[in-house]
Amino acid sequence: KKNGYAVDSSGKAPECLLSNYCYNECTKVHYADKGYCCLLSCYCVGLSDDKKVLEISDARKKYCDFVTIN
């Protein structure tokens, strides 16, 4: 499993202000374990390896991984 910004068919990650929205978006739409709002987009934790995710910088990924774990 992997973490990242899950993208829809148009290649965009859902934008967010609230983590509740992302939890639902990530778990119900993308079947991840959890979801959080990180840097204004929904960051999903526990996505299946075949899910498409947004290409992001290592620094941004490390930041979101750090924030979602703590």
Curated annotation (Swiss-Prot):
Tissue distribution: Expressed by the venom gland.
Major subcellular location class: secreted
GO annotations of cellular component type: extracellular region
Recorded GO MF terms: sodium channel inhibitor activity; toxin activity
UniProt GO BP: defense response
Gene3D superfamilies referenced in this protein's UniProt entry, alphabetically: Knottin, scorpion toxin-like (3.30.30.10)
LCN-type CS-alpha/beta domain ranges (all copies): 2-65
Listed SMART domains: Knot1
Subcellular location: Secreted
Keyword field: Disulfide bond, Ion channel impairing toxin, Neurotoxin, Secreted, Toxin, Voltage-gated sodium channel impairing toxin
Disulfide feature: 16-37, 22-42, 26-44, 38-64
Superkingdom to which the source organism belongs: Eukaryota
Function: Excitatory insect beta-toxins induce a spastic paralysis. They bind voltage-independently at site-4 of sodium channels (Nav) and shift the voltage of activation toward more negative potentials thereby affecting sodium channel activation and promoting spontaneous and repetitive firing. In vivo, this toxin induces a fast excitatory contraction paralysis on fly larvae. It is active only on insects.
Family: Belongs to the long (4 C-C) scorpion toxin superfamily. Sodium channel inhibitor family. Beta subfamily.
Domain comment, as recorded: Has the structural arrangement of an alpha-helix connected to antiparallel beta-sheets by disulfide bonds (CS-alpha/beta).
Name of the protein in question: Beta-insect excitatory toxin LqqIT1
